[in-house]
Amino acid sequence: MPQALTLADWAKRQDPNSKQAKIVELLNQSNEILDDMVFAEGNLPTGHRTTVRTGLPEATWRMLNYGVQPSKSTTAQVTDSTGMLETYSEVDKKLADLNGNTSEFLLSEAQAFIESMNQEMAETLFYGDTTVDAERFTGLSARFNDLSAKNGVNIIDAGGTGSNLTSVWLVTWGLNTIHGIYPKGSKAGLEQQHLGEVTLTDDKGGKYQGYRTHFKWENGLTMRDWRYVVRIANVDLSKLTKDPEATGAIDLPDLLIQAIEKIPNLSMGKPVFYCNQQVRSWMRRQIKNSKNVNISMQEVAGKKVVSFDEIPVRRTDAILTTEDQVVAK
């Protein structure tokens, strides 16, 4: 069975002092999801095929001298694909050589590219849909977008109908629940390859010597058990008021409690809430509300983190404030 580790854990196993660890550190700085999301190697060169249990076998109370009818569970196979996220960084050789440590300079110059890839990955994690963009992977929203679907019981309708709607997600990361994947035979995380000195061309066609670096990140998402993901959809940001119990306001703490109660067993993985900046800012300001008993600040891995019922609340700017209303289809 493959192991599910965060990218930081994978980097440490490869080499505690490797450049990969530095890249992962840069990734984590601008993408809080990577502090929680675990990855495992897929069983396909292009993704991962998993067997999902769709029904449990029946058990029977037996009387003496009476037999028991055989029963079996029902399963379905699901194939999740990975996407290939790539970019190139090009830097003037003269500039890179000035500080005497070319490798460190190239990595520092590449931070903008790494952050761009981070944002693209986070956006795809929440909104990727291979029926629209085949080159990406299928994210969370495409899996939880129908109130009448079987997994619609894990979509909580916050009641919003306007144009400034958002979602709050509760994801329980784990090998048997939901986790990231990378292709069979490849490496976890973002790969950096220095292509060395090349001749570059400026906007006017002029030639100059420079260094080219290739970045590649192959990743995807697989969901073993949809019961361990909850979407609080149709959250109208205009109704997030100072007093969540005021008339016309969204009682977000109550919705968060409902989400927690939908998870069958929180110990099956690492539960984390994800929301955008506006929602987490509201939650942080609620800490000093005299009525608040659920929201607090906790220290997780040396960082101060907003928590709800001791579950971390991560800020993810990839979550939109202009989502379409989630309805029954």
Name the predicted role of every residue range.
Residues 45-76:
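N-terminal low-complexity, intrinsically disordered segments
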Residues 2-35, 48, 71-329:
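Core alpha/beta structural scaffold of self-assembling particle/tube/pore-forming proteins
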Residues 40-43, 100:
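N-terminal assembly/attachment segments of tailed bacteriophage virion structural proteins
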